[in-house]
């Protein structure tokens, strides 16, 4: 049987891979193969398509890799969840659909690193806009012709959203009408990646739907990448397994480039399995070294968060929606009308604040939710309630990803090393105390009952630290494990090209040099849009001159 050859092979049909597949195949003379280890994004499966059902995919294995960390030493040795998307759409198929770009100062910080001078906010904003269609139209900060549908909260949504934003303002923090606009600090409405018909706007729906009928795009699902193939230092193809038979290895060849888009956990794992990584470690795993690159799998970062939960004195929360006998009507309204509770992720308000003046831009994020429940759908409080998700944004803690074996089906060793610095503890103590202050503002007086969690009896540093150690959870934002840059631990350059190799790029959240202030999906899509132009050797989009807010010191 002849080996198939394509111009480009993309590994991973996720938030970045689907962008590349769609953009590269706009050139009709270019052939692209898209390999995805998971299955299709079944459009009739409410678990991934209904925004309010976002907890369901995290409870199963069909759409979730369901990684676990090693025992985290500063978190009572808990093995913590690290859910990642599996299937067309990747993590955009199972995420919380919060459309948050981070802060302009994140990108300004990246651009100060050697070699990353073209990653300023002015360089990147045009690519955020290119990807977006916002339901209320475009402006200097937002797009109106992009593949990703973005929905804005409406004034008649749950009263608790408005009360929580108002409470934040009463506590002395700014108000903003657009967390992705001029002022990315303060409390306000939070946009979401949802279509006008109330469906999840994953990159499979947004990008693959416009590209999958093109004759120059081939998509193979249930294709687990074993390794990238090299001729010397040149990436020339990919070896993958389709189905469960590990002996059934298939090879495909790339004329131009292999584009690794498997995410912050799997991309370094695939590189290591392919012989790219720290050479001593690779030899210890009996892997032939193709290229010694010590930064592969290092610099791993994430956001940690916790829930502060309160009883609600008025019957205005979403608690009734958790009752089985109310769910058929909610489901029908969503299915047939694309409206109602089912059409929202229910993260319609939130914000970013600075816990102290030492921070130049916000270091704490809030998501407000008008029901008291864990993100993965567990431990729902059996009465009316509401909660704030709160966590620090730029932890100094660093972790790593390491292979456990050469078996592509074995999950790697993951250690985030959460809460390993004194700054982490200071920020989380401050976050709890600030949240309590916000929750006790007059705007919430009509609604706020007693504090369910952590519970008002916990107030000392030691008590709060114990609560964080035992109850903080991932915000599902792993990143930075194949970082961009030019220092000794950088894995790729400013265009995602792997240092020391030819014909190989990494394009996903793993190449962020530093984690951003907020949810990762919008920025991952932006990065893929930007690098797609570089792969196609197109001129970059004109830089934006839109201003952005920076708090005065």
From Swiss-Prot:
Its EC number is 1.1.99.1, 1.2.1.8. FAD binds at residues 7-36. Belongs to the GMC oxidoreductase family. It holds the Pfam family GMC_oxred_C. The active site is at 477 (proton acceptor). One of its GO terms (cellular component) is membrane. Pathway: Amine and polyamine biosynthesis; betaine biosynthesis via choline pathway; betaine aldehyde from choline (cytochrome c reductase route): step 1/1. Involved in the biosynthesis of the osmoprotectant glycine betaine. Catalyzes the oxidation of choline to betaine aldehyde and betaine aldehyde to glycine betaine at the same rate. This is Oxygen-dependent choline dehydrogenase. SUPFAM superfamilies: FAD-linked reductases, C-terminal domain, FAD/NAD(P)-binding domain. GO terms for biological process: glycine betaine biosynthetic process from choline. It comes from the Bacteria.
């Amino acid at each position: 049987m002849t080996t198939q050859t394509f111009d480009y092979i993309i590994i991973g049909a996720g938030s970045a891979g689907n962008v590349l597949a769609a953009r590269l195949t706009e050139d009709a003379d270019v052939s692209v193969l898209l390999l995805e280890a998971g299955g299709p994004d079944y459009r009739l499966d409410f678990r991934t398509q209904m925004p309010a059902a976002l907890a369901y995919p995290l409870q199963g294995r069909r759409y979730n890799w369901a990684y676990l960390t090693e025992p985290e030493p500063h978190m009572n040795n808990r093995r913590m969840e690290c859910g990642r998307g599996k299937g067309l759409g990747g993590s955009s198929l199972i995420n919380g659909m919060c459309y948050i770009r981070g802060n302009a100062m994140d990108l300004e910080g990246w651009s100060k690193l050697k070699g990353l001078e073209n990653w300023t906010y002015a360089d990147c904003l045009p690519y955020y806009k290119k990807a977006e269609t916002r339901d209320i139209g475009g402006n200097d900060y937002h797009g109106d012709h992009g593949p990703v549908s973005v929905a804005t909260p409406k004034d008649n949504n749950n009263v608790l959203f408005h009360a929580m934003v108002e409470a934040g303002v009463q506590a002395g923090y700014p108000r903003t009408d657009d967390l992705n606009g001029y002022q990315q600090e303060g409390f306000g409405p939070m946009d979401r990646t949802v279509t006008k018909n109330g469906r999840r706007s994953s990159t499979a729906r947004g990008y693959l739907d416009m590209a999958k009928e093109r004759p120059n795009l081939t998509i193979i699902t249930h294709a687990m990448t074993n390794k990238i193939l090299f001729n010397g230092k040149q990436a020339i193809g990919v070896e993958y397994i389709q189905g469960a038979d590990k002996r059934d290895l298939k090879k495909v060849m790339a004329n131009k480039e292999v584009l690794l888009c498997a995410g912050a956990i799997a991309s370094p794992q695939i590189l290591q399995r392919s012989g790219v990584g720290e050479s001593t470690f690779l030899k210890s795993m009996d892997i032939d070294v193709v290229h010694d690159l010590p930064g592969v799998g290092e610099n791993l970062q994430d956001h940690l968060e916790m829930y502060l939960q309160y009883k609600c004195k008025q019957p205005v929360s979403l608690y009734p929606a958790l009752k089985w006998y109310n769910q058929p009507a909610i489901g029908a309204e969503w299915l047939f009308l694309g409206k109602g509770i089912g059409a929202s992720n229910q993260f319609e308000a939130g914000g970013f604040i600075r816990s102290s003046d030492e921070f130049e831009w916000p270091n704490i994020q809030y998501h407000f939710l008008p029901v008291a429940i864990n993100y993965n759908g567990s431990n729902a409080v059996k009465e009316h309630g509401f909660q704030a998700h709160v966590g620090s944004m730029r932890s100094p803690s660093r972790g790593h990803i390491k292979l456990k074996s050469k078996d592509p089906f074995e999950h790697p060793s993951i250690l985030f090393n959460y809460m390993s610095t004194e700054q982490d503890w200071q920020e989380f103590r401050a976050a709890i105390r600030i949240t309590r202050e916000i929750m006790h503002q007059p705007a919430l007086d009509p609604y706020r009952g007693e504090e369910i969690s952590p519970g008002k009896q916990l107030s000392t540093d030691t008590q709060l630290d114990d609560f964080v150690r035992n109850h903080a959870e991932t915000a599902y934002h792993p990143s930075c494990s194949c970082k961009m840059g030019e220092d000794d631990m950088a894995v790729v350059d400013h265009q995602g090209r792997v240092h020391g190799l030819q014909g190989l790029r990494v394009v996903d959240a793993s190449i962020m040099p530093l984690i951003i202030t907020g949810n990762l999906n919008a920025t991952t899509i932006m990065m893929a849009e930007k690098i797609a132009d570089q792969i196609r050797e197109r001129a970059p989009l004109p830089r934006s001159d839109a201003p952005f807010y920076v708090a005065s010191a």
